Regions:
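Short His-centered aromatic/hydrophobic patch
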Residues: 88-94, 113
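Short, structured helix-loop element that forms part of the nucleotide-activated donor/catalytic region
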Residues: 43-47, 234-261, 265
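Donor nucleotide-sugar binding/catalytic pocket of nucleotide-sugar-dependent glycosyltransferases
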Residues: 54, 136-188
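A short, histidine- and acid-enriched strand-loop-helix "catalytic/donor-clamping" loop
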Residues: 9-14, 59-62, 103-125, 138-140, ...
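A conserved mid-protein helix/loop that constitutes part of the nucleotide-sugar donor-binding site
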Residues: 14-20, 203-226, 323, 331
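Short hydrophobic beta-strand element within catalytic cores of glycosyltransferases
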Residues: 303-306
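Aromatic "clamp/platform" in nucleotide-sugar-dependent glycosyltransferases that forms part
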Residues: 267, 286
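Conserved acidic donor-binding segment of nucleotide-sugar-dependent glycosyltransferases
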Residues: 318-319, 323-330, 339-345
Length: 387
């Protein structure tokens, strides 16, 4: 039985992003081991997926002592488990995991690039040392979108043969059974509505993600406050502040906390229920590999307004499947919000077109099968002794 290790710094990745994949692989004859830092989700994940889990401590940021301890734990784990395939899903897990597994002799080392490289704003700067080491020690680099693939082939300096795009992109597609209006529980819908407390005819503008500068929260809040529709709308932000990591201005924070037309929630396990209430989803991010929330909104047929960063425009096409505005342009975003309010029938048509595309290309079951087949091919190569 081939052995597969799935590596992430935080266990929440297995619960929210990769759920179902370990179970599917186990059912298809693989021995699966999940590896991450400790967390309260682990027992629930192991029960749901039917797989083992090993704890390796990871710390945020750069800490040479703690990072070396994590590396050594990973190296000894690889030597003990001797997996056929290791697959990492975030930058620190990729950096430490690819290096440790290479030195431990793991033949197939896959890293999923889920975020744009740090040189996106200035390609001449080249990749960071962490990115270079990660890419050098991986045997395959799975990218999230067509736009990301084009960018990396042009600007990374890494041989193009290492980069792979499975299907049309995305880490694991979208669960069309979960993000389905017919499947939502009434009590959760009521609870979501009670937290927002919309007026009878309020236009609900939803944003999901960390409240950081990189996610375009400052522009979104500014555009909303300046818009002509503010008295007839509510802005709902689902995400926590990350002031120590990527701070937004105190002025923006004050608006979020005090404006009667803005609602902020740190987190929720029921994003689908808030999408069901929303009239439009706004994703104003400055950088994106391929946003899962865009797929989730599309599956729920919620109209989308997004920035023109690479990961967004790989899915959303201007005035075909949504509205696209230049990164950081408050005035254009304001106009898009007002257009979405007035031309709801037009936005609905965009959402219908996008829904058909997502069902065809990004159904989680289809994406899972593509990944499973890729792993199977690696296992066959392993049996034949091929690289």
């Amino acid at each position: 039985m081939p052995k597969y290790i799935l590596l992430s710094t935080e266990p929440i990745t297995f619960k929210l992003l990769l759920y179902g994949q370990p179970k599917l692989m186990q059912e298809q004859g693989w021995e699966v081991l999940l590896v991450s830092a400790d967390g309260r989700e682990i027992q629930q994940i192991c029960r749901a997926e039917g797989v083992r889990h090993e704890v390796v401590p990871f710390v945020k940021g750069v800490n040479f002592v703690e990072d070396f301890i994590s590396f050594w734990r990973l190296f000894t784990l690889m030597r003990k488990e001797r997996p056929d395939v290791i697959h990492s899903y975030d930058s620190k897990a990729g950096f430490l995991g690819m290096l440790a597994s290479n030195l431990a002799g793991v033949l197939h080392r896959i890293h999923s690039i889920t975020e744009m490289p740090t040189n996106t704003k200035d390609p001449k700067k080249g990749l960071t040392l962490r990115e270079k080491w990660t890419y050098a020690n991986a045997t395959r680099l799975w990218v999230n979108s067509t736009g990301m693939l084009t960018y990396l082939n042009t600007n990374s300096g890494v041989e193009a043969s290492k980069f792979e795009l499975l299907g049309s992109g995305s880490t694991l597609g979208v669960d069309l059974e979960k993000f389905n209006r017919q499947a939502l529980k009434e009590n959760h819908l009521v609870a979501a509505t009670m937290r927002i407390l919309p007026g009878e005819n309020d236009f609900i503008i939803l944003a999901v993600g960390q409240l950081t500068k990189r996610k375009g929260i400052e522009e979104l809040v500014a555009a909303f406050v300046k818009s002509k529709i503010i008295s007839k709308s509510k802005l709902v932000l689902i995400g926590a502040f990350e002031q120590e990591k990527d701070p937004i201005s105190q002025e923006t924070i004050q608006v979020i906390r005090e404006h009667p037309r803005v609602v902020q929630l740190d987190s929720t396990d029921h994003v689908a229920h808030y999408l069901a209430i929303a009239d439009v989803l706004v994703h104003a991010s400055h950088e994106e590999g391929f946003s899962n929330v865009l797929l989730e909104a599309a599956a729920m047929q919620v109209p989308i307004i997004c920035s023109n960063c690479i990961g967004n425009t790989s899915l959303i096409k201007q005035q075909k499947t949504g509205l696209v505005f230049p990164i950081g342009e408050v005035a254009v975003l304001k106009e898009a919000l007002e257009f979405a309010f007035v031309k709801r029938d037009v936005l609905t048509k965009y959402a219908e077109v996008l829904f058909e595309e997502v069902v065809d290309k990004f159904d989680r079951k289809k994406v899972q099968q593509l990944q499973l087949e890729a792993y199977r091919q690696l296992a066959k190569y392993q049996e034949k002794g091929l690289p």
